[in-house]
């Protein structure tokens, strides 16, 4: 018995792995940017930091996955956008620290390598990288029979960005009286899907719920996470924002306080939050308490900015989209987030 046949009999298809690499090359090429060194397939991805032109560079890194949203991608056999979700979860975190994404690496683990499916996954990763301005400089596809079912896979990503030391955003500049501006989310994004799947467990995904304005349920549930790099980066370069919050797992209650010091709080005007139809549907069909919705989901705001009052008009001018003035920073009395 040859070694190759022995490995194949154990459930690992080496040839399928090679095919994945060949299929994804054209997608990786789309993400090329200044600073990338070497070619795809090396032992390590390389990047020349001097090409960024940053005088006092601070590297900022982030890693994340997309949770059980993957289970819906598998259920509905739609894999071409889940990669964008993975990129978004990572780059939105580092943009919140004031960093411009430079490069990205992905990791896919599966029970059986399916070259067509994983080309779709990586095409989504590449699309996310293009939107973020990050190069896809490396990755890994691990075939692990026995660990995962044949149709199952997991996806994680790793982003590295750079910031001028003087432009880092760490919450220290946020002050009482700052205005809280919200940028719209594209949907649920990539958090809370264990609850989402429970609520819609008996649905096929083809339903046209009245709350969803003519869209099929599965399309709304798999809407890719918005990437905020292009919107936020010009504001960071002009030093117009004092704090940035990426509203992910834990919703408003967990993420907004990460924007500022412990002696401050956020006062949110609920009437000004652009709640998306899917959240109204989740609250209704899941019988979820209204206040709990803000503890789980982004509720229609995926990125929150703390801005000095005198800079609000300039921020709105630079952002070519609706901007929601949803609250302000106050002195903390009890709770870190007060929703009125």
Curated annotation (Swiss-Prot):
GO molecular function: ATP binding; phosphoribosylamine-glycine ligase activity; phosphoribosylformylglycinamidine cyclo-ligase activity
A Pfam family the protein falls into: AIRS
Keyword Translocase among record annotations: no
InterPro entries assigned: PurM-like_C_dom, PurM-like_C_sf, PurM-like_N, PurM-like_N_sf, PurM_cligase
Location in the cell: Cytoplasm
Signal sequence, start to end: none
Entry annotated with the keyword DNA damage: no
Domain of life: Bacteria
CDD domains, A to Z: PurM
Its EC number(s): 6.3.3.1
Keywords: ATP-binding, Cytoplasm, Ligase, Nucleotide-binding, Purine biosynthesis
Main location: cytoplasm
One Gene Ontology biological process: adenine biosynthetic process
Any one GO CC term of the record: cytosol
Metabolic or biological pathway, per its Swiss-Prot or TrEMBL entry: Purine metabolism; IMP biosynthesis via de novo pathway; 5-amino-1-(5-phospho-D-ribosyl)imidazole from N(2)-formyl-N(1)-(5-phospho-D-ribosyl)glycinamide: step 2/2
Family: Belongs to the AIR synthase family.
Protein name: Phosphoribosylformylglycinamidine cyclo-ligase
Gene: purM
């Amino acid at each position: 018995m040859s070694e190759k046949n022995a490995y194949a009999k154990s459930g690992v298809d080496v040839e399928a792995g090679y095919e994945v690499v060949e299929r994804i090359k054209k997608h990786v090429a789309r993400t090329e940017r200044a600073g990338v060194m070497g070619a795809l397939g090396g032992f390590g991805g390389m990047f020349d930091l001097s090409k960024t032109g940053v005088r006092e560079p601070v590297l900022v890194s982030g890693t994340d996955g997309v949770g059980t949203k993957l289970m819906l991608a598998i259920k509905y056999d739609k894999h071409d956008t889940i990669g964008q979700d993975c990129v978004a979860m990572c780059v939105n975190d580092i943009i919140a620290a004031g960093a411009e994404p430079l490069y990205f690496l992905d990791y896919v683990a599966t029970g059986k390598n399916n070259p067509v499916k994983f080309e779709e996954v990586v095409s989504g990763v590449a699309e996310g990288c293009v939107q973020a301005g990050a190069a896809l400089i490396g990755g890994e596809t691990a075939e692990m029979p026995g660990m995962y079912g044949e149709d199952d896979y997991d996806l994680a990503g790793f982003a590295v960005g750079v910031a001028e030391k003087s432009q880092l955003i760490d919450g220290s500049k946020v002050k009482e009286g700052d205005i809280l501006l919200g940028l719209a989310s594209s949907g649920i994004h990539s958090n809370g899907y264990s609850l989402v799947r429970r609520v819609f467990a008996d649905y096929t995904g083809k339903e046209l719920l009245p709350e969803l304005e003519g869209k099929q349920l599965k399309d709304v549930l798999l809407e890719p996470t918005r990437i905020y790099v292009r919107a936020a980066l010009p504001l960071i370069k002009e030093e117009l924002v004092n704090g940035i919050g990426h509203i992910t797992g834990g919703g408003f209650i967990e993420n907004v306080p990460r924007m500022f010091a412990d002696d401050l709080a956020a006062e949110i005007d609920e009437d000004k939050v652009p709640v998306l139809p899917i959240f109204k549907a989740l609250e209704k069909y899941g019988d979820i308490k209204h206040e709990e919705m803000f503890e789980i989901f982004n509720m229609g705001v995926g990125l929150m900015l703390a801005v000095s009052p005198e800079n609000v008009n300039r921020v709105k001018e630079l952002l070519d989209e609706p901007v929601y003035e949803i609250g302000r920073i106050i002195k903390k009395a009890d709770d870190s987030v007060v929703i009125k």
